[in-house]
Amino acid sequence: MKIFIVFELLDQPTGGGNQFLKMLRKGFDHKNCLTENPEDADVFLFNSHHFLKNVSSYKKSFPRAKFVHRIDGPMRLYNDLSDARDQQVYFANETFADATVYQSDWSKNKNLEMGLQPNQIHTTIQNCADNIIFYPLEKPKTNTKKIRLFSSSWSNHPKKGFDFYNYLDKNLDFNQYEYYFAGRSPVNFTNIKNLGPLSSDILATELRTSNIFITASQNDPCSNSLIEALSCGLTCVALKSGGHPEIIKNHDFLFETESEFIEILDKIKNNEIIQKNTIRNPLQVTEEYITFFEQILT
């Protein structure tokens, strides 16, 4: 079986889809399943609303191949209701896809509620991070004077949690905490140090020097930034929204209000709650994709 990924992968700081597909490409290559020539492909994997003209062309040229659609969203929930990309995804899934991969059950259910016509063949495969880059320290971090907090977001959309980060910037006790942010922010922080967009290698290093990762993104289907932080061994605290509860299975680390977050932070600081991370590795996720593709081909 040969797999062709319909996506232009970039080696620079960019969104989670690009990062995950780069990792998946390496996994397919390691398993000798990857092809760079569409003429050799048994399976075409395409992503969300990206490169649909290419997908349409390949579908016409290679009608015997199977086309698998990896879906996130709904984008109308984490962007705004005028976002037309969901309709492009739904059209592509109905027109081109022989099967669908959802990134979380939350994403699957919300897309179906908002108009996606279900594909008869589908599965849910959660994302993972590249463990060559995102891995924990061998020795636990020694105690420092301040607890190091970290957040990241490639997108600067307000629903990525910036109102909440702004609240923390103004209200946290920065005698106890230091706080770093990586990515693009619409907020000019006073106390939080904005590192800007970082390459994966540098981001992973920054994560490993931190203690607690915080995400307040709303309606995020399967947050790659959260998975990267967990993979680096951080204790992670997340807004109870989107696919976060499927990634952080211990609800002691999920919050809905500012006061709940502060309570969780205090419990972590006092060692009253301890998080045990259960993140899958790229080999497992790659094998899940390959097994699903093999089922489609039989």
Language-model segments: what does each one mean?
Residues N79-D80, L112, N127-K145:
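Acidic anion/phosphate-binding donor-loop and adjacent secondary structure
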Residues T95-Q120, A129:
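A short, active-site helix/loop in glycosyltransferases that binds the activated sugar's phosphate group
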Residues N270-T298:
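A charged, aromatic-enriched C-terminal amphipathic alpha-helix characteristic of glycosyltransferases
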Residues P140-K160, N166-K170:
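Conserved donor-binding/catalytic core segment of Leloir-type glycosyltransferases
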Residues D83-T100:
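Membrane-proximal helix-turn-helix segments that form the acceptor-binding/catalytic region
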Residues T235-A238:
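Short hydrophobic beta-strand element within catalytic cores of glycosyltransferases
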Residues Q218:
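Aromatic "clamp/platform" in nucleotide-sugar-dependent glycosyltransferases that forms part
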